[in-house]
Amino acid sequence: MMSKCSSHNSLYALILLAQYHNITVNAETIRHQYNTHTQDFGVTEWLLAAKSIGLKAKYVEKHFSRLSIISLPALIWRDDGKHYILSRITKDSSRYLVYDPEQHQSLTFSRDEFEKLYQGKVILVTSRATVVGELAKFDFSWFIPSVVKYRRILLEVLTVSAFIQFLALITPLFFQVVMDKVLVHRGFSTLNIITIAFIIVILFEVILTGARTYIFSHTTSRIDVELGAKLFRHLLALPVSYFENRRVGETVARVRELEQIRNFLTGQALTSVLDLFFSVIFFCVMWYYSPQLTLVILLSLPCYVIWSLFISPLLRRRLDDKFLRNAENQAFLVETVTAINTIKSMAVSPQMIATWDKQLAGYVASSFRVNLVAMTGQQGIQLIQKSVMVISLWMGAHLVISGEISIGQLIAFNMLAGQVIAPVIRLAHLWQDFQQVGISVERLGDVLNTPVEKKSGRNILPEIQGDIEFKNVRFRYSSDGNVILNNINLYISKGDVIGIVGRSGSGKSTLTKLLQRFYIPETGQILIDGHDLSLADPEWLRRQIGVVLQENILLNRSIIDNITLASPAVSMEQAIEAARLAGAHDFIRELKEGYNTIVGEQGVGLSGGQRQRIAIARALVTNPRILIFDEATSALDYESENIIMKNMSRICKNRTVIIIAHRLSTVKNANRIIVMDNGFISEDGTHKELISKKDSLYAYLYQLQA
């Protein structure tokens, strides 16, 4: 088990190597992402972290004598956690210049000294060509680097395929010998020898085919894992606007298209392509037997291609329609399950069932049209195949009768023709799958080709103090949408408690979304401690802002896991203290499992008020410098709200607090109250100042609630 010190050394070595390659890294981001406070920062975590910041790292085991040929600098990995950065080796390999991350100094070792500390493990590091956070355009060309990456393994598959095709070439020759020699001359001894040889060939063919399938499946599975991992990482890195502009079911449907690509990669299509590649050899042998019969087979190949090209656009249009209907069904299903309480309470199940039946009927009809086109395509392929077989048999019989070829040669030719046509038939039958994969790649591309949130280029970012400033901020959610915020100028000093009130739709919550950098203002600047948020790393920002919404989602984990979600390294005492401040400790203690109670999906095992208090504790446990309450207490009963209001002075201590509320009693004691109206700041002052203005919007709203 690595110590915290060794984990720190590993992380520091990563930062140094990144800086060497002109990549700036925020150490705290890496610590947070890989939880180095409580977990080891081992080889796997190191490699993943290197990949995430734009480095290409590979862990290898090399003999000491081969260190002179590796690319430097490289990380010398040691089991005791005392790693070294190997910077330079003299030409005669007599001196080794290394940097010690623990001692923060460069050291020079002789060959014998360095050989003693070297344990045979090294991490090679180079920089990637692509920019961190951005992906190359996702289409079929995305798989080319994977093919290059696994070229050695794929070369093995190609070699095995060549042997398989060679064995397939021998089989027809055996039949020819049996028909033309053994049967004619009644050569039983020759028959026995051929049979034994045939059995050996069959065994080798089975073994090699199994080996090829295993190697190929293993390689495609690795490509599948890479794509799946990249998809999920990219999905979480997308801006909030991506998810707000799409229904959940549609996004889920696009992600599920990965299954279609997975089935295609692990199916027969690619091995059929390999088999087709070796058909050239078979054609040469077939031409030797009979040029006329070979021409029949060759002329049939364009027929397969033309028919497939004719069917393709019809099939693709119907597959596209099928996907859209399936995505609509997915979205409707997710929406229905999510809103099941509302549907039950309003007794609208019959209407929902009618809508589902209508959509399902449309999807089934679309699927039937896909199957109809696919069936037509397959029947056309079979018609071509059987027509070629009849023509070959008719011509072959004429050639046998005329004495141009023997019966054995005709049988051997037909077997060879079968070996050539089989992969063509398989590919033609798999054309539907290829069209489906094309649709899947296109739909996944909608996710993977969407730009992720831009990260900061700064290396070290200071901790937030809490000064906030909005300068001439104007914002709308879309370029042709309504202006939500207009000419917002606001300065909030660190440690202030600010209340934001106003009518619904006045831009209160949008203000806090901009503060979390979910969106970038159309014009103007938002500054925290003088740092422009449009240039800041969103992870650095959000780790130091605690947010409690009106409706908060809890994960299907224990209460303690939900409270410490953003910072698993905090102690139990810190988590309990946060729960006390949030008024959650007492009810948690009364639960049978206490803090280990599983809350259920989205916290369904708890009441709304209990979920809200846990969400408040979750926001407080990280000790954020800025705390945002967006209607956070509106779902609480008066007793729970009273507990939080009593603790408000402790909650607000040494942090900037922004409270958005419709219930004006919540913000009564704030240092300042900002009144929003139609995207503008209409009023600004204390409760007493605003209430004294009888014609003010705040006084009007307060009077309505009195």
Curated annotation (Swiss-Prot):
The active site is at 83. Keywords: ATP-binding, Cell inner membrane, Cell membrane, Hydrolase, Membrane, Nucleotide-binding, Plasmid, Transmembrane, Transmembrane helix, Transport. Residues 1-125 form the Peptidase C39 domain. Residues 468-703 form the ABC transporter domain. ATP binds at residues 502-509. One of its GO terms (cellular component) is plasma membrane. InterPro entries: AAA+_ATPase, ABC1_TM_dom, ABC1_TM_sf, ABC_transporter-like_ATP-bd, ABC_transporter-like_CS, ATPase_T1SS_HlyB, P-loop_NTPase, Peptidase_C39. It is found in: Cell inner membrane. GO terms for molecular function: ABC-type oligopeptide transporter activity; ATP binding; ATP hydrolysis activity; peptidase activity. It is a multi-pass membrane protein. The chain crosses the membrane at residues 153-173, 191-211, 269-289, 295-315, 388-408. NCBIfam families: type_I_sec_HlyB. Belongs to the ABC transporter superfamily. Protein-1 exporter (TC 3.A.1.109) family. Part of the ABC transporter complex HlyBD involved in hemolysin export. Transmembrane domains (TMD) form a pore in the inner membrane and the ATP-binding domain (NBD) is responsible for energy generation. This is Alpha-hemolysin translocation ATP-binding protein HlyB.
